[in-house]
């Protein structure tokens, strides 16, 4: 594994301020633009604290949206990813109608998705280029020929913290508000993106209009304050192989035709494309930072007033439906709806009932309702 220590981190500085446009022509002749933004941030990630990092944000927008003004204030949306999969893979799958970002863009929204530090196309701290910073178990699984002893880490702590994630999000939010000349945006988040987006919103309610949270990783046991050591000791990062994703997904299949192999293939291809270094490890993996978490507590949630739509997949075994029901019960917002989505796992946006999810999010973002309801629980797809 020593050879992996020689892999160099990409220089973030050369990316700052760059924007690349890729027009996409839809089947119906309606042109979409995909714009790649790299936003400079003074990092608070402990391994690179004080350095300038580049946060990647993908924009999907209808070309006809054109000139933006204050009248479009409720039409800017920021997607925030979960613990493992970067945002551009999570929410912009390049297969048929599975791009959540594209669905909202076609409805007239200016849609962005960001990668926090260590994910996807954002800056990856150099310690993430060393496979010795994986857990012992993941090192041995990755080692060609089956190594019998793990190597010693060069960085023996979690790579990021929830506070550094909030800092990244805040930098992007402020950039987008200024870029589009609006005072608020809405946020859509998945899994660990729940504590990231809703935790940020709780601190800055004036900047967030509405929330849509798929499988929000809420726990009533979350610590209110940071641990004694920040970041916590342990692996700096984790990896996922194609076989890992297959196994994790398949154990959450609860109905026939829940997902298509072609969708899986599109997701995995995009995953590997987002991580050219990880693609060279073993049979190819995606890397993600380990995050020290705290702060998004039941007290914070009970004080939150931001209108929130939350969704739980009936077969989710990563964030159990009971946790999302707890979140609904604890949330202080007067306008809140919980969707119980049939035939769905943790990966609901890549599955059979993805359009029910997308349609509900659109109604929430435009009207603040689901099936006309401002509050309550809705069962869809049964």
Explain the meaning of each model-derived region:
Residues 64-113, 123-126:
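Short, surface-exposed "cap/lid" segments of acyl-processing enzymes
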Residues 344-355:
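Catalytic histidine-centered segment of alpha/beta-hydrolase-like enzymes
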Residues 180-191:
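Alpha/beta-hydrolase fold nucleophile elbow
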Residues 212-221:
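Active-site nucleophile loop of the alpha/beta-hydrolase fold
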Residues 27-72:
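N-terminal cap/lid segment of alpha/beta-hydrolase-fold proteins
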Residues 132-179:
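Alpha/beta-hydrolase active-site loop
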Residues 221-311:
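Alpha/beta-hydrolase
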Residues 317-323:
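Conserved alpha/beta-hydrolase "acid-adjacent" motif
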């Amino acid at each position: 594994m020593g050879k992996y220590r020689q892999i160099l981190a990409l220089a973030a500085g050369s990316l700052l301020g760059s924007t690349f446009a890729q027009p996409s022509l839809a089947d119906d002749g309606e042109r979409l633009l995909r714009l790649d933004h790299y936003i400079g941030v003074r990092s608070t990630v402990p391994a690179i604290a004080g350095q300038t990092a580049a946060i990647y944000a993908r924009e999907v927008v209808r070309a006809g949206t054109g000139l933006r003004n204050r009248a479009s204030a409720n039409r800017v949306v920021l997607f925030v990813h979960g613990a493992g999969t970067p945002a551009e893979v999570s929410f912009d799958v390049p297969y048929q109608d599975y791009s959540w970002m594209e669905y909202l863009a076609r409805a007239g929204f200016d849609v962005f998705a960001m990668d926090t530090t260590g994910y996807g196309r954002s800056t990856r701290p150099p310690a993430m280029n060393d496979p010795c910073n994986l857990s012992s178990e993941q090192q041995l699984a990755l080692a060609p020929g089956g190594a019998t002893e793990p190597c010693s880490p060069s960085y023996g702590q979690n790579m990021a913290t929830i506070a550094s994630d909030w800092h990244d999000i805040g930098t992007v939010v402020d950039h987008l508000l200024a870029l589009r000349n609006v005072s608020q945006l809405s946020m859509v988040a998945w899994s660990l993106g729940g504590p990231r987006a809703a935790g940020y919103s709780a601190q800055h309610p004036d900047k967030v209009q509405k929330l849509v949270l798929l499988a929000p990783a809420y726990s009533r046991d979350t610590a209110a304050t940071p641990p004694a050591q920040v970041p916590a000791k342990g692996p700096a990062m984790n990896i996922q192989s194609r076989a890992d994703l297959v196994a994790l997904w398949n154990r959450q299949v609860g109905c026939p035709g829940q997902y298509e192999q072609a969708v899986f293939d599109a997701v995995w291809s995009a995953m590997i494309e987002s991580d050219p270094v990880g693609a060279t490890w073993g049979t190819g993996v995606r890397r993600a930072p380990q995050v020290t978490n705290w702060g998004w507590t039941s007290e914070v949630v009970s004080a939150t007033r931001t209108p929130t739509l939350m969704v739980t997949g009936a077969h989710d075994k990563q964030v159990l439906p009971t946790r999302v029901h707890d979140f609904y019960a604890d949330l202080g917002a007067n306008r809140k709806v919980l969707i119980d989505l049939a035939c769905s796992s943790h990966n609901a946006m890549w599955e059979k009932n993805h359009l029910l999810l997308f349609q509900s999010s659109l109604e929430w973002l435009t009207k603040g309702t689901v099936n006309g309801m401002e509050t309550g629980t809705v069962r869809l797809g049964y």
